[in-house]
């Protein structure tokens, strides 16, 4: 039986976000998914947070350099909010309105986890920032790539080679364990939007799980269904 086509708002692009700890493989899996969607004749762009737009990329440099941490969790949250506001209004929303799929490496859940759960920024502050920056924008699907902390940090170290760890990679092991737990809690609280995928496997196996998650939610079009059978 053929997979379901998109629902009533089929002219709107789909918004897929990828979340997870350091070294979980988000960037790689986003690239694989984008290539598969494009092969299925679906327009898709890849973007990231913090960053994704010229203004937001400037802020990305600041926060990953550690400047945000020196200013404190509330100020760092404001930096992320400023970056997200620019990103949403100049990249994400315009693309979705044109029927383009947007695949984003991190989004609002990362702020909830890093600055909220681990930085102790109050939920009221985060809610206010989301009202300003994203309004009613919500991902159609959030893929949370889950790997053991030690595996993720080893991958991150291998990826950067001789380079210094960024502001978040440099945190201690306890921080990263809390991070993993926080993402699992978000998934449990919003199972209709979120799917947790075991990413401690080879690239093809993880990519297949991501693709299956899209089908489970009837997000892919008939063209994508045909491509999956090729």
From Swiss-Prot:
Keyword line: ATP-binding, Kinase, Nucleotide biosynthesis, Nucleotide-binding, Transferase
Enzyme Commission identifier(s): 2.7.4.9
Binding positions (ATP): 20-27
GO biological process, one term: dTDP biosynthetic process
Pfam (any one): Thymidylate_kin
GO-annotated molecular function: ATP binding; dTMP kinase activity
GO cellular component, one term: cytosol
Record's catalysed reaction(s): dTMP + ATP = dTDP + ADP
SUPFAM superfamilies, sorted: P-loop containing nucleoside triphosphate hydrolases (SSF52540)
Family of the protein in this entry: Belongs to the thymidylate kinase family.
Annotated PANTHER family: THYMIDYLATE KINASE, UMP-CMP KINASE 2, MITOCHONDRIAL
Function: Phosphorylation of dTMP to form dTDP in both de novo and salvage pathways of dTTP synthesis.
Official protein name in the record: Thymidylate kinase
Organism this protein belongs to: Nitrobacter winogradskyi (strain ATCC 25391 / DSM 10237 / CIP 104748 / NCIMB 11846 / Nb-255)
Source taxonomy: Bacteria, Pseudomonadati, Pseudomonadota, Alphaproteobacteria, Hyphomicrobiales
Gene that this sequence comes from: tmk
């Amino acid at each position: 039986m053929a997979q379901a086509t998109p629902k009533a708002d089929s002219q709107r692009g789909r918004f897929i976000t990828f979340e997870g700890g350091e070294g979980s493989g988000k960037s790689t899996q986003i690239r694989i998914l984008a290539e598969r969607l494009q092969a299925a004749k679906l327009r898709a762009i890849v973007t990231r947070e913090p960053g994704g737009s010229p203004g937001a990329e400037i802020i990305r440099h600041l926060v990953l350099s550690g400047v945000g941490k020196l200013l404190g969790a509330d100020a760092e949250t404001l930096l992320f909010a400023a970056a997200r506001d620019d990103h949403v209004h100049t990249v994400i929303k315009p693309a979705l309105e044109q029927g383009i799929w947007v695949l984003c490496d991190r989004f609002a859940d990362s702020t909830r986890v890093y600055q909220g759960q681990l930085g102790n920024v109050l939920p009221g502050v985060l809610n206010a920032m989301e009202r300003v920056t994203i309004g009613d924008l919500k991902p159609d699907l959030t893929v949370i790539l889950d790997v053991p902390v030690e595996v993720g940090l080893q991958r991150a170290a291998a990826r950067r080679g001789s380079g210094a760890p960024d502001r978040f990679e440099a945190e201690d092991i306890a921080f990263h364990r809390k991070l993993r737990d926080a993402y699992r809690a978000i998934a449990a609280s919003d199972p209709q939007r979120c799917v947790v995928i075991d990413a401690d496997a080879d690239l093809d196996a993880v990519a297949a799980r991501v693709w299956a998650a899209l089908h489970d939610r009837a997000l892919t079009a008939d063209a994508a269904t045909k491509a999956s059978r090729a």
